[in-house]
């Protein structure tokens, strides 16, 4: 194995999750203590460039020890690569961003963020392979939420 390069992720402390988009041109990063999501381009040789965008989340939740600020815990592009989703444990919100793959930019989508019950603590999620359902695991209240993303709105 060989390290091709490295870049500063730009989103603050404790990057905790990364995932590559369907085209292989971008990697998305969640920064737990930075309260941010970053979009990083992937070059033709597989190395990475400087972030094209860093989106900062604001807010907090009712748990003073775990939700004192935004804590994006996971970030994933949707199955069609049109949207990027973010579970924010600190704010009890599930974000959806429209993704511009040509420019490597995110824009908050209509109907987002989805606010979950106070103290839920959304952490990880996955997409159903045949429907528009998203299964969202909430760490702090030990629940599983099913989100219907049908029709372009949450």
Can you say where each PLM-predicted feature lies in the sequence?
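Conserved beta-strand positions in repeat-built beta-propeller and related beta-rich domains
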Residues: 29-32, 78, 86-89, 128, ...
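Short loop/turn segments immediately following the C-termini of beta-strands
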Residues: 32-34, 42, 89-90, 99, ...
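A generic, well-ordered mixed alpha/beta core segment in the N-terminal half of proteins
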Residues: 4-54
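Acidic, glycine-rich loop-and-beta core segments that form the ion-binding/anion-interacting portion
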Residues: 109-154
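Beta-rich, blade/repeat-based domains predominating
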Residues: 10-22, 26, 58-82, 116-134
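Beta-propeller fold detector
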Residues: 2-8, 49-59, 106-114
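Structural signal for beta-propeller blades
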Residues: 1, 35-38, 92-94, 142-144
């Amino acid at each position: 194995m060989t390290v091709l390069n490295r870049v500063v992720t730009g989103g603050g402390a404790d990057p905790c999750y990364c995932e590559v988009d369907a085209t292989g041109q971008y990697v998305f990063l969640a920064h737990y203590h930075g309260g941010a999501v970053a979009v990083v381009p992937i070059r033709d040789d597989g190395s990475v460039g400087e972030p094209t965008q860093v989106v900062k989340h604001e807010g907090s939740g009712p748990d003073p020890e775990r939700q004192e600020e935004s804590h994006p815990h996971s970030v994933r592009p949707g199955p069609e690569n049109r949207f990027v989703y973010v579970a924010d444990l600190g704010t009890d919100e599930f974000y959806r961003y429209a993704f511009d793959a040509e420019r490597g930019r995110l824009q908050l989508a209509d109907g987002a963020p989805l606010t979950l019950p106070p103290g839920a603590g959304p952490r990880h999620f996955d997409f159903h392979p045949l429907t528009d359902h998203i299964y969202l695991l909430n760490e702090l209240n030990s629940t599983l939420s099913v989100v219907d993303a049908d029709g372009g709105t949450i």
